[in-house]
Structures are given as structure tokens and as C-alpha cells.
């Protein structure tokens, strides 16, 4: 009949439709949706005739980056000990909406003193520097199989342990004594050459002599 046609009652099977009031609509699919969206609508003419119609819009999937829900806590070790870290631990706060496999890459120390060794079997070894204790922060990337990635942080603590005193210099040479004469021995002389890496005060105990009486 040559009547003018118009579209009314436009509905989408997914997402949000907004009329732009100029003969166009904006369709915003739901977050992370991909697949077909069905459009149902009425085609009307200027004389009241209508017909139901439909169309399909295909939404192409795109890769979504992995996401993390927080910092990974790796616990604590004693000073001088090593820590074995597993990929499962490092991935424990990560997820991927596309259900892709996730991998750990570029694990490194960003705070604290120590080094990381990749054991090549999905585990890593952290070794703190000798005689060091404190807080450690690790950084790494979690990647999916399609190139998506996210940066992650992990923490652990290295707890102090007491270190034994060490002879780090030359021992004092004690003055010679005189026969049948008492000899004064000073703690300060016996401690010469010894040090303690923890900065603890040093004292002398269990002093024994190969001859004579000690008081």
C-alpha cells in the first residue's frame, strides 16, 4: 500500500535497550556476555497494520583478563630457612570468567632481602639473605592462555632467631702471671675478638682453668 512503516515494542533477549528517540536504539549486552541476542519487535504501518518480526545479533567473545580477590599470604619462616612456594598458592586468589587455565610468570622479590629460584616443576624456592629477618613482598603476573594478565602481590615474614656469638677478630693475649701469685682475669679481656650479629650483650660463663683455683 506504500504506507509508512515503523518499529515498536522492540525487546532484546539480553542486555539493556535504550531508545535514542531518533529511530535508533542502543543495545548494551550484559557484562561478559557473548553469543546470540534475539530482537523481537512489531512492524506497523500508518493504517494500523502490524506484523511480528525478529532479528539475531551475534556478540563475538573477547578474552577477559584474570582477576584477583586480594593479596596472597604465604605465612612465615624462621631466619636462615627456605620456603617452597607452589603455583597453587600463588593462584589461590585468582579466577578467570572464561574458565581458562592460569599460569604464574615473573615471580620476584620487591621488598625484603632474598632471592627466588624457579624449580621448573610449578614450585619456587625463596631463600632469605643470611642473618636477615623482616617482611617480604613478592610480585608476579598471572596470565591466561589467550594473553590476558593481571599483576598480583604476595607477602611472607622471616622471623628472627638468635645467632650464636662468633670469634670475628683476634683473641686477647692475657698478661703473664707470677708464680705463687693470684691472677685477676677480666671478662672484658676474655670477650675481645667476639661479636654477636644480633647486637646482644655478651657475657662469660663456665670459665675453667687447667691449673689452680678459680674464684
Which positions does each model-derived feature cover?
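Calcium-coordinating acidic loop motifs
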Residues: 33, 46, 132, 145, ...
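Extracellular and select intracellular beta-sandwich modules with Ser/Thr-enriched
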Residues: 36-37, 49-55, 62, 135-136, ...
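Short, solvent-exposed loop/turn segments at the edges of extracellular beta-sandwich modules
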Residues: 43-49, 142-148
Amino acid at each position: 500500500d506504500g504506507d509508512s512503516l515503523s518499529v515498536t515494542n522492540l525487546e532484546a533477549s539480553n542486555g539493556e535497550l535504550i531508545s535514542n528517540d531518533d529511530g535508533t536504539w542502543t543495545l548494551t549486552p550484559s557484562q561478559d556476555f557473548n553469543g546470540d541476542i534475539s530482537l523481537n519487535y512489531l512492524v506497523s504501518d500508518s493504517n494500523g497494520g502490524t506484523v511480528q518480526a525478529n532479528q539475531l545479533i551475534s556478540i563475538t567473545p573477547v578474552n577477559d583478563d584474570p582477576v584477583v580477590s586480594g593479596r596472597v599470604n604465604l605465612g612465615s619462616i624462621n631466619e636462615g630457612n627456605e620456603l617452597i612456594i607452589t603455583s597453587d598458592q600463588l593462584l589461590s586468589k585468582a579466577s578467570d570468567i572464561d574458565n581458562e587455565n592460569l599460569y604464574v610468570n615473573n615471580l620476584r622479590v620487591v621488598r625484603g632481602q632474598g632471592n627466588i629460584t624457579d624449580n621448573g616443576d610449578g614450585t619456587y624456592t625463596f631463600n632469605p639473605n643470611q642473618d636477615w629477618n623482616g617482611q617480604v613482598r613478592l610480585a608476579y603476573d598471572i596470565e591466561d592462555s589467550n594473553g590476558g594478565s593481571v599483576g598480583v602481590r604476595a607477602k611472607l615474614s622471616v622471623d628472627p632467631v638468635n645467632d650464636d656469638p662468633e670469634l670475628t677478630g683476634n683473641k686477647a693475649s692475657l698478661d703473664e702471671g707470677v708464680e705463687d701469685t693470684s691472677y685477676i682475669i677480666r671478662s672484658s679481656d676474655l670477650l675481645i675478638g667476639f661479636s654477636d650479629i644480633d647486637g646482644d650483650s655478651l657475657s662469660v660463663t663456665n670459665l675453667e682453668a687447667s691449673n689452680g683455683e678459680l674464684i
